[in-house]
Amino acid sequence: MDHIRNFSIIAHIDHGKSTLADRIIQLCGGLSDREMEAQVLDSMDIEKERGITIKAQTAALSYKARDGKVYNLNLIDTPGHVDFSYEVSRSLSACEGALLVVDASQGVEAQTVANCYTAIELGVEVVPVLNKIDLPQADPDNAIQEIEDVIGIDAQDATPCSAKTGQGVQDVIEALIAKVPPPEGDADAPLQALIIDSWFDNYVGVVMLVRVVNGTLRPKDKVLLMANGSQHLVEQVGVFTPKSIPRDALTAGQVGFVIAGIKELKAAKVGDTITTMQRKAEAPLPGFKEVKPQVFAGLYPVEANQYEALRESLEKLRLNDASLMFEPEVSQALGFGFRCGFLGLLHMEIVQERLEREFDMDLITTAPTVVYQVEMRDGTVITVENPAKMPDPSKIEAILEPIVTVNLYMPQEYVGSVITLCTQKRGSQINMSYHGKQVQLTYEIPMAEIVMDFFDRLKSVSRGYASMDYEFKEYRPSDVVKVDILINSDKVDALSVIVHRSNSQYRGREVAAKMREIIPRQMYDVAIQAAIGANIIARENVKALRKNVLAKCYGGDITRKKKLLEKQKAGKKRMKQVGTVEIPQEAFLAILQVDDK
């Protein structure tokens, strides 16, 4: 066991985490040069294109060190994005060490810090590495200073390397072997194995990626999943080099995969503990929690006959993504669709993109909302994730909204504009600290403000230099109201939004004005109104198209003209009673693009 090293790589997006992983795999001969490709651990197309890692992957490598010993290195690739922070914490708790990769030309950024703190809390040994030192603008001294200031770990002996050219990668592995402790654990104790990740394979069912903490796991063992108490028979165990290679057993300290004929992903939850039926472990490994969606949106097929296809696509996606939730929903305006729950905005974008790419779906997405807690007058508390389900205001005692703590990092010249943005978004400043040229701001901001367009606005006010991460803090009472949009005094449920009262007038006016541009003129007047409860706060009219009925009167008596105009008016009135206004697709997208001033 002294020769095993379990480690993962922590980095901000684009600091070269996947490239470094590629180099380490190549150096240890995990794949032949022919099989080697860029970002070998990012298996989804969308991961490669966006340059992000979504699912955790592993590679078991053997490396002959300079001291002549052969070490088994288990690389556990973690997602870097805040939406997947639970996956990150599970991957890190399976390791004893982590390589902290910092881009020498950019210094420390938000997600590096967030994941690094997670690692330190879990007691993982952090080994700093400076990447991209081959770039002309690299400034290693400044980067070292930032690591020490912001994260507070000693970085004087940080290993410089360039994952692109391969220079210094061997030093990185040597530093890793020297600094990271070998795993502790007893191969003869009752089995405890942590599920780091799980995904669905069409041939064998669910494949679980596990880190064996104590005990030994062999094929034909009867195992128990401790979170939900289900029992399964192990069919195969093995390791990834990233290719899968079967093994006879996985012992304490090793990382590998387990196939046990599980049919659905819900059974194998990330963070759960596996133990054997013969000798049960006394307690599960700590840290397991159910992942709860934070952001909800409605997904509707453009063509009504695509509903079943959408359900199938969502079910297939859920096979590989246990944190995706969905339930059927009916909207008067959009027909049948699904209310989906996501971990965060990036997760939502990825799911939408995968539906459109892998399953050829055409989708309409409603505005993303967060989960509100509503205290009713009769003392009950309900959760509302869909504005259309918000109860009648007269029955509501108080509405609580989720507040998140946001950490922002940016060069100091952008501080002013970022603070202005946070204040607009109803943020309250908690902390501000300077680290060299970088500034760290901590704010508490309502989550509802973040899901709308905070990230895009942050990037535009800081010219792309600011980076952020956020975590849920608590629910707080807030004066939020539901703004309904009425078209010819009919509510359009898909257009309702929940906003803060201070912003509701403006929001209502903006949406009504936007709808007026988008809804085509009809044969009769269309009234667009924004309402809070029974109070109308804004109104716009779309004027009717009308024929010039007086064209045939040459001069003549006024009563004749009046008669024709009255007749036209009566006809329009009749049409308005029976006519329905078709709301074009763009209208639903327009709601997402209303700027908050």
UniProtKB/Swiss-Prot annotation:
- Tell me which Pfam families the record gives: EFG_C (PF00679), GTP_EFTU (PF00009), GTP_EFTU_D2 (PF03144), LepA_C (PF06421)
Q: Where in the cell is it found?
A: Cell inner membrane
Under the heading SMART domains, the entry gives:
EFG_C
* Topology versus the membrane: Peripheral membrane protein
- InterPro entries given for it? EF-4, EFG_III/V, EFG_V-like, EFTu-like_2, G_TR_CS, LepA_C_sf, LepA_CTD, LepA_IV
Taxonomic lineage is:
Bacteria, Pseudomonadati, Pseudomonadota, Betaproteobacteria, Burkholderiales
PANTHER family linked to this entry: TRANSLATION FACTOR GUF1 HOMOLOG, CHLOROPLASTIC, TRANSLATION FACTOR GUF1-RELATED
Q: Which GO terms describe its biological process?
A: positive regulation of translation
Cellular component GO terms, alphabetical: plasma membrane
MF terms (GO), sorted A to Z: GTP binding; GTPase activity; guanosine tetraphosphate binding; ribosome binding; translation elongation factor activity
- Occurrences of domain tr-type G (ranges): 2-184
Which catalytic reaction applies to this protein? GTP + H2O = GDP + phosphate + H(+)
Q: What is this protein called?
A: Elongation factor 4
Q: Which PROSITE patterns match?
A: G_TR_1, G_TR_2
Q: Which family does it belong to?
A: Belongs to the TRAFAC class translation factor GTPase superfamily. Classic translation factor GTPase family. LepA subfamily.
Principal location: membrane
Q: Which UniProt keywords apply?
A: Cell inner membrane, Cell membrane, GTP-binding, Hydrolase, Membrane, Nucleotide-binding, Protein biosynthesis
Q: Which parts of the sequence bind GTP?
A: D14, H15, G16, K17, S18, T19, N131, K132, I133, D134
Q: Which organism is it from?
A: Cupriavidus necator (strain ATCC 17699 / DSM 428 / KCTC 22496 / NCIMB 10442 / H16 / Stanier 337) (Ralstonia eutropha)
Q: What does the function comment of this entry state?
A: Required for accurate and efficient protein synthesis under certain stress conditions. May act as a fidelity factor of the translation reaction, by catalyzing a one-codon backward translocation of tRNAs on improperly translocated ribosomes. Back-translocation proceeds from a post-translocation (POST) complex to a pre-translocation (PRE) complex, thus giving elongation factor G a second chance to translocate the tRNAs correctly. Binds to ribosomes in a GTP-dependent manner.
Might you give the EC number(s) for this enzyme?
3.6.5.n1
